[in-house]
Amino acid sequence: MIGTSAKHGWEVGLSRFTIKILWLNENVAIAVDQVVGKATSPLTAYYFWPRHDAWEQLKTELESKSWITEAERVELLNQATEVINYWQEEGKGKPLAQAQARFPELVFTGSN
């Protein structure tokens, strides 16, 4: 594993990227921002699950950016997988604060 984290097993994007999560009752959406200095710049759109195949859309978008290394893509996609699995298996309908506590290294926003 590249960049391991004791809590979840992944340290996202080697500090070059931030994963943003839109936590909703009926969907979860995932986007990636690039860290530029002390700010961030949107790198992808928000991709929604289960409305669409967010993981596959994110994978395609990341692969289109040749300057992102394979290790970084794998790391970002593994984190997306963890979030989607959590939302599907136990997080759907749970409060935003609970999801934030589960994934403190990610940026969350939402309606609940």
Swiss-Prot record:
Transmembrane segments: none annotated. The keyword Ribonucleoprotein applies. GO terms for cellular component: ribonucleoprotein complex; ribosome. It comes from the Bacteria. Pfam families: PSRP-3_Ycf65. InterPro entries: PSRP-3/Ycf65_sf, Ribosomal_PSRP3/Ycf65. Keywords: Ribonucleoprotein, Ribosomal protein. One of its GO terms (biological process) is translation. The keyword Kinase does not apply. GO terms for molecular function: structural constituent of ribosome. NCBIfam families: PRK02724.1. Belongs to the chloroplast-specific ribosomal protein cS23 family. Part of the 30S ribosomal subunit. Probably a ribosomal protein or a ribosome-associated protein. This is Probable small ribosomal subunit protein cS23. The lineage of its organism: Bacteria, Bacillati, Cyanobacteriota, Cyanophyceae, Synechococcales.
